[in-house]
Amino acid sequence: MGKLTLLLLVLLGWLQYSLWLGKNGIHDFVRVKEDVAAQEANNSTLKARNDQLFAEIDDLNGGQEAIEERARNELGMIKPGESFYRLVPDQSRRNAGTPSTQNNAQ
């Protein structure tokens, strides 16, 4: 019975070593689990970006309004016969936030 107990203890020790330190053990499992979580986060970011791009494609295929909006905002285009006005803030309001550079002669 002593040999059987010793054999079972050796077998238990070998199984514990394989579980904790061996190939595909607990350490590898935790590392792979973290890698999977990071990849899932990356995938969700890319999926949101893809959804946004598909929505933009559908919008551009849907009509002329989206194309006109992009032409106006990104390219600065206007329709024939339109006048373009740019509103620039007053010089006094623009400089109100900056410190004054006055020289005080004494």
From Swiss-Prot:
Residues 31-62 form a coiled coil. Residues 22-106 are periplasmic. Residues 1-3 are cytoplasmic. Keywords: Cell cycle, Cell division, Cell inner membrane, Cell membrane, Coiled coil, Membrane, Transmembrane, Transmembrane helix. Signal peptide: none annotated. It is a single-pass type II membrane protein. InterPro entries: Cell_div_FtsB, FtsL/DivIC. HAMAP family: FtsB. This is Cell division protein FtsB.
